[in-house]
Amino acid sequence: MNDKIVVDVLKLYLKRDPSLTEFHMLKSQYKNIQRVNIFNKEIFISLIKKNKKKFFSDIKSSPSDIKRSILTYFSKQENTYSIGKLYTIIELQSILVTTYTDVLGILTTKGPDLFTSNIYYNTSSMQSLARDALNFMNVAQMTDKTMGRHNVSSLVDNVNSLMEEYLRRHNKNCICYGSYSLHLLNPDVKYGDIDILQTNSRTFLIDLAFLIKFITGLNVVLLKVPYLKNYMVLKDQNDSHIIDSFNIRQDTMQSIPKVLIDNIYIVDPALQLMSMLKMFSQIDRLEDLAKNPEKLTVRLATLLEYVRVNYGINFISNQTKKNNMPMYSVIDIDKRIITVDTSNYDFPFKKCLVYLDESSLSSDILDLNADDAIDFENVSNSAFLINNNILYTYFSNTILMKSKTDIHEISSRGLSAHILIYQILTKGDIIKPLTDIVNSLIGVEKNPIYDIIPRDKKSGKHGIIDIEKDIITH
């Protein structure tokens, strides 16, 4: 590349002659800087204004405020002399100019025809079953602590409106799960933010962060949490939650069974039901249950009604046949490994070794010299490997004990649900074990928690993207 051309591009970008250090350090960014230089900011400003009108109409900011905010950011480099900060500004501006139109700008244009779904689940027959099942699981003490996920930003409703359209336009690479997906099946389910899985989380959240910044003037930050794989959360300046997203590979996306509702793909509720049963092994989720059992009752009833209708599951109130769920599980507390007997089902393995420490699982997989482990990322929170009729996997939640040696039924069911998640994702045998696990919710004893085996502790530092401070650490 001709040095004079590079100097001219840098001079146009910085609105000053670049120093020798700036020239040598920034010339590798020539193409990105050139894209920013030729970017049509007037069209971009128009897109942001349309986004505001459609999704943030209640926010009090004028068109001139928005224009000023955008032009100020695109001239920020002119008064920045730190090479590190310049790199950050260039990276973020480059993401905006190359992706915003396709990611968020498109949401203001006319979309494809909406094929309204007639799917609606009347859960009245499942309400009693769900309420009884949750009552038997309601064995934790209420606490006053507030989990981070409960501190919700005032911008959530605006972002939810945007997300509904985003899910329709980008339904090949973004799907939803959780309370909003159940709301689409049953309007009685209330939801807060919208839980999503997508293949381009980082780009989407950066574009959304800028949209919020330009419209509201607020500084929002993106955090990457070390103990959750490929997870990012967008927070406002009060550290309140706006939206989060798990990033997954395209092959993982293709493995997930989905249901199309109103042009939005949701994770198959059978898979969501298994995730919910698995979740109850986590002690703080049982504390949530103790605080608000009715909220979870309508969600569980919706999931149960879905599997009843779509999987032909029969609920048997007076069970005469032996139910093999939860599958028999034995824990080695010192090794933190649980052995689950899976021999009663037509699985491609006869037992399962469930590791409570992910590093131990990884080490043992290496020792087995096996290279066919499957990792479904955040969908399962574990890799899986079948070797010599044994399924090896990792369980990321706490284990509840009902005695010094016996695993509590809540955790045994959670372990069984984790194994069924593997079966669902690999399209294996599911109907018989699914029938058994949902029927295992009927007529169970309510046992107190004797002890709690802690979950695997993850180390690492939080990553951050702070637009205002020109910081990127992930």
UniProtKB/Swiss-Prot annotation:
This is Poly(A) polymerase catalytic subunit. It catalyses: RNA(n) + ATP = RNA(n)-3'-adenine ribonucleotide + diphosphate. InterPro entries: PolyA_pol_cat_Poxvir, PolyA_pol_cat_sf, PolyA_pol_nucTrfase_Poxvir, PolyA_pol_nucTrfase_sf_Poxvir, Poxvirus_polyA_pol_cat_C, Poxvirus_polyA_pol_cat_N, Poxvirus_polyA_pol_cat_N_sf. It is an enzyme of class 2 (transferase). Coiled coil: none annotated. It comes from Lumpy skin disease virus. The active site is at 193, 195. Polymerase that creates the 3'-poly(A) tail of mRNA's. It comes from the Viruses. The gene is PAPL. Keywords: ATP-binding, mRNA processing, Nucleotide-binding, Transcription, Transferase. The lineage of its organism: Viruses, Varidnaviria, Bamfordvirae, Nucleocytoviricota, Pokkesviricetes. One of its GO terms (molecular function) is poly(A) RNA polymerase activity. Belongs to the poxviridae poly(A) polymerase catalytic subunit family. GO terms for biological process: mRNA processing. Its EC number is 2.7.7.19.
